[in-house]
Amino acid sequence: MFDVIDFFCGCGGTSEGLKQAGMNILLGLDFDKDALETFAQNHPDAQVIHRDIREVSVDDLLRLIPGLAKKRRKRPLLFSACAPCQPFSKQNRQKSSDDRRISLLSECERFVVALEPDYILIENVPGIRSTSADEGPLDRFLSQLKALRYQEPVVQVLKAERFGVPQLRRRLIVMVAKNGRAVNELSETHGPGKENLVTVRDTIAKYPSLEAGQTDAIDALHRAASVSPLNLKRLRATPVNGGRLDWNADLRLSCHSKPGHTDVYGRMNWDRPAPTLTTRCVSVSNGRFAHPEQDRGISLREAAALQTFPEDFQFAGSTISIAKQIGNAVPPLLAKKIGENFTRHYREQNGKNKRRPKTKR
């Protein structure tokens, strides 16, 4: 079993998946109070730090978990560093090279130097590699790992739907080992010649019908955001698989005639994976986030399911906060498969998957 320190843990999507892969979550660190409360509810045995990572020292971690020190460790240690992705996202139109969040990944270096984790996982949007013409934060961090004699990093851009996640979501991951050979790349499990892609229908068709603004009587997370009377008219005018291009002129705004953002007010397609869920994934005016048939946006429960959170996962905060937590999260199913990949590497390096030699009779 691995021990895990989850920097920038958010609500705990990565930790949930790593836990499902058999790992032990020691600590989560995040600056978002609601997200950290969600993490704590779902990982009650883990320590939590509600502070900016720039204000956290190595000694702070060692005071909470003395066994982190390399000489005292009994199990392999994994650092997960999924730093905020907004500075690198294509959807961030106000990104700036001065955005202080860009430096957050480099903050992990001092923890790596002091504690020498056996494995490191980095997850972000693909744009983290193209922040500027100069060497970006990821390349700088990987150069630092090389200087610390870590193995060659495996850098992959994954399509989450090719790993069983019912959502089109491209993410860059980096997997690094301290000892032995490099970690293997992840192999896709879904798509042409493999298992079928998991669809919106497969994932959310089971949930009860709702009206906009309604909350299910049994499941409080299955609640749909309210919409204005005009937006309700727009939803009623949107056919299955349709969007705002299907409306009559009286329902359109002047901005709707401009190119781009054609997905807003669009319905999800029952028989395809969902579009990428964002921090506003329950708002019909912010993407193709309308229910495939019902005249409402998807509920928080449906959004969580499309991100592969289990039914018993508890969320803290307001509707806006929970939607943000869900949209920011690493899909637990994807994290589980990454965790299993690390575990295979460890077992192979330690001879636990090697065949025993045949004994002579």
Roles of regions detected by a PLM:
Residues 2-116, 126-130, 134-139, 146:
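Core alpha/beta nucleotide-donor-binding catalytic domains of modification enzymes
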Residues 2-5, 9-23, 147, 171-325, ...:
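S-adenosyl-L-methionine-dependent DNA methyltransferase catalytic core
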Residues 50-51, 150-162:
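Conserved S-adenosyl-L-methionine
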Residues 61-64, 156-161, 260-262:
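Short alpha-helical segments and helix-capping/turn motifs at coil-helix boundaries
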Residues 119-125, 156, 316:
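Short beta-strands and strand-loop turn motifs
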Residues 125-130, 322, 326:
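Conserved short loop/turn motifs at secondary-structure junctions
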Residues 164-167:
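Short glycine-biased active-site loop of nucleotidyltransferases that positions the nucleotide triphosphate
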